[in-house]
A protein has these predicted regions:
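Nucleotide donor/acceptor-binding cores
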Residues: 2-4
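Short His-centered aromatic/hydrophobic patch
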Residues: 82-88
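Active-site proximal beta-strand in glycosyltransferases
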Residues: 6-7, 95-103
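Short, well-ordered alpha-helical microsegments
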Residues: 46-47, 88-91
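Proline-aspartate-enriched helix->loop->beta-strand connector
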Residues: 76-78
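N-terminal strand-loop element at the rim of the active site
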Residues: 8-63
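Short hydrophobic/charged patches on amphipathic alpha-helices used for structural packing
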Residues: 65-69
Length: 103
C-alpha cells in the first residue's frame, strides 16, 4: 500500500506556537506506516527545530503561488494542511485538485 503524503504548509520560518503544534502532529503520526508527513515553509530558524525533531522539511524560497506549485509538483502530496491565513490562501490557489485543509 502506498503511503498517503501530507504536506503541512506554513508561512513562518520561525519556531513558535503554530509551528510547535505542527511538529507535535507530525511526531504523533510518525508511527503510522500509511502516512508520510512533511513540513513546508520558508527556510530559517525553523530548520534547526525540525532537524532536532527528525521532521522532513521542504524549504521554499517564499510563500507564493508559483513556489508552492513548484513544491507540489516535486513532492506530489495527497493532501495539503495549511496552518495560517496566508498559507491557506496561497495553498488554495496553488493546490489544483489536491484537497486542502485550512484553519
Amino acid at each position: 500500500m502506498q503511503k498517503i503524503k501530507i504536506m503541512h504548509l506554513l508561512q513562518s520560518d520561525r519556531f513558535s506556537g503554530a509551528e510547535n503544534v505542527v511538529c507535535q502532529i507530525i511526531n504523533m503520526m510518525d508511527n503510522n506506516d500509511n502516512i508520510e508527513m512533511t513540513y513546508c515553509s520558508s527556510d530559517g530558524q525553523i530548520r534547526e527545530a525540525l532537524n532536532e525533531r527528525n521532521i522532513r522539511f521542504l524549504p521554499i524560497r517564499k510563500l507564493t503561488v508559483k513556489e508552492v506549485k513548484r513544491i507540489i509538483k516535486e513532492y506530489k502530496p495527497d493532501l495539503i494542511h495549511a496552518h495560517d491565513m496566508r498559507a491557506s490562501f496561497i495553498g488554495a490557489l496553488a493546490c489544483g485538485n489536491i484537497p486542502i485543509i485550512s484553519h
